[in-house]
Amino acid sequence: MSERILITNDDGIDTPGIRWLAKAVLRAGHDVVVAAPMTEASGSSASMTAIEEDGKIVVEPRELAGARNVPAYGVAASPAFIVLLALREAFGEAPAVVLSGINRGANAGAAVIHSGTVGATLTAAHAGLRGLAVSLDVLTPVQGSVASGGAAIDQLDETDEKRHWGSAAGLAVKLLPVLAHTPVGTILNLNVPDLHVDGIRGLRRASLARFGQVQVSIAERSEGFVRTAVQAAQENLEPGTDLAALAEGYASVTPLRSPSENRDVRLNLESIRVQTPAL
């Protein structure tokens, strides 16, 4: 019997990316359970947040179109918290692998710090599991620059079903055997161009770009409020990075790991006096 795979995301249980991913993984013969936030949780990183009613976290059974045989749950919690709940067998047998996505929008470069999609896999890796974060590059920097982040999300809502989710789902399934041969605690971050699979030039291992696709600026501020805007990053693409690979029509794969001690930093702590000198 194959190992159980948890599929989650940060866009919410009702978005198409998670349905496409669940269908593809199920068809590949894997044991799958889906648990994802009830509502949008983008930018939640690895936060441990939940909405409780009388001390209880709400969990609702859901049915995924095209994957009705997959047990699925909408959960009033962040993606990372959902992973934690799954590890405690809240949704049946604990998973051995966590897939997160398919995110609507690339999680490339510095953006991985804020991503709830990646945050879920970081939580899994910290617990000794392997994880795969999957994102589809559906929002170009130009699109992200035309309005605020909220308006950009509204635009995505209108065009969700027209995206090439199948391309990302298929590549994710093909990466699972590769992931299985990595050390425990490994995360693979997959970013896929929004193209038919025949239009994708291939897979490239890539480093993280020093910046994300878009940057937030202050569009307006006054008494009691600020208004932000999303702008295309003004940096030049560096060869060998994930953003450069996407721009050239490649899907990028970047191995990540959960936070750990930086042994290269030397600290002189002996010179610091902790106790207050006696007067």
Task: Annotate the PLM regions.
Residues 106-115:
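Glycine/threonine-rich flexible loop motifs
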Residues 11-16, 223-224:
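Short acidic, Gly/Ser-rich segments with clustered Asp/Glu that frequently serve as metal-coordination loops
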Residues 125-150:
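Glycine-rich phosphate/pyrophosphate-binding loops
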Residues 2-5, 19-89, 93-94:
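A cross-family phosphate/adenosyl-ligand binding-site feature
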Residues 149-279:
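Electrostatically charged, flexible surface regions
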Residues 24, 120-125:
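Hydrophobic/aromatic ligand-binding patch that stacks against planar heteroaromatic rings
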Residues 33-35, 73, 99, 130-134, ...:
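Hydrophobic/aromatic beta-strand patches that form the interior of the parallel beta-sheet core
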Residues 97-106:
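Short acidic, glycine-rich surface-loop motifs adjacent to enzyme active sites
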